[in-house]
Amino acid sequence: LYAVQGWLFNHEGTRRGVEFVTRKITQNVARIADEFARKENFEPLRLGNIDSKRDWSDAEDFVDGVWKMLNQEEHLTYITRKKPDDYVLSSDETHTIKEFVEEAFNFAGFHRSICRWEGHGEEAKYYHGDDLLMEVDPKFYRPAEVDLLWGDSERARKELGWKPKTNFIQLVNKMVKHDMELLT
């Protein structure tokens, strides 16, 4: 029996469900950018803990990694003479939800040079000039919040020749662009 176990850290993309924080961010950033451009009043994005760190990668990169895992038997037979093994797929870096928010708004035209954070923790707010873009709302804190999820894909990189092609900023931009296009 050929069996492989893959540990896939947070993998995001344009098809991610809206119930996940990354898609909640990109969908709301697109909405806010659209309403701002039309000079309409808008409700800010509301999130829970923006200080938790995640190891985010593009789901498309993981498809390639999973394919390599499932086809490693041939690859490993010739190179290392090992049996199929288990691997972690991850970006090997972490970013806070706060960083995701900043990148998303930056891509949508709310440039960092004009935006600012006020307050910390449950009091954190993100402004563009006088316009409130995002605020922390304690009701969105999860009771069993994990502060840090961080992978180590060194083995998959060495043994399978896998590595992510999409970096964090590219991933955020891709997701925001997709949600902005859905509004046009």
Which stretches of residues belong to each language-model region?
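A glycine-centered loop/beta-turn motif at secondary-structure junctions
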Residues: L1-A3
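Conserved catalytic-site region of short-chain dehydrogenase/reductase
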Residues: H11-R15
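Conserved beta-strand scaffold in the Rossmann-like NAD(H)/NADP(H)-binding core
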Residues: Q5-W7
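C-terminal substrate-binding subdomain of Rossmann-fold SDR/epimerase-dehydratase oxidoreductases
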Residues: R16-T184
